[in-house]
UniProtKB/Swiss-Prot annotation:
One of its GO terms (cellular component) is chloroplast. Binds directly to 23S ribosomal RNA and is necessary for the in vitro assembly process of the 50S ribosomal subunit. It is not involved in the protein synthesizing functions of that subunit. It holds the Pfam family Ribosomal_L20. This is Large ribosomal subunit protein bL20c. CDD domains: Ribosomal_L20 (cd07026). It comes from the Eukaryota. Keywords: Chloroplast, Plastid, Ribonucleoprotein, Ribosomal protein, RNA-binding, rRNA-binding. It comes from Ipomoea purpurea. Belongs to the bacterial ribosomal protein bL20 family. It is found in: Plastid, Chloroplast. SUPFAM superfamilies: Ribosomal protein L20 (SSF74731).
Length: 116
């Protein structure tokens, strides 16, 4: 019988995995089995947090807009402001409004005065 030498495919797969997990701490960057488990876990977390990031930024934008709008008066709120925007067909999204609220509050006051 001739001797069959192992191929390079498994080694290539482990090398790729090691490159991915090289920044992990302890055994998670050295042992193959724990490396695979941590790689799966990291990818699951990344996938979940990409969706969560969208929610978190939307909440942040709404909070920033609301904080600046409420300085005008107690009776005026974020929901009334957004309602007035839609009523007057001003197409500004929350991200842009939040940037305006931080960088130039007077501009946001002008927008809110125009739509009221």
């Amino acid at each position: 019988m001739t001797r069959i030498k192992r191929g390079y495919i498994a080694r290539r797969r482990r090398t790729k995995m090691h490159f991915f997990a090289s920044s992990f701490r302890g055994a998670h960057s050295r042992l193959t089995r724990t490396m695979t488990q941590q790689e799966k876990r990291a990818l699951v977390s990344a996938h979940r947090d990409r969706d969560r990031q969208k929610r978190d930024f939307r909440r942040l934008w709404i909070t920033r807009i609301n904080a600046v709008i409420r300085e005008r008066g107690v009776s005026y709120s974020y929901s009334k402001f957004i309602h007035d925007l839609y009523k007057n067909q001003l197409l500004l999204n929350r991200k842009i409004l939040a940037q305006i609220a931080i960088s130039n509050r007077k501009c946001l006051d002008m927008i809110s005065n125009e739509i009221v």
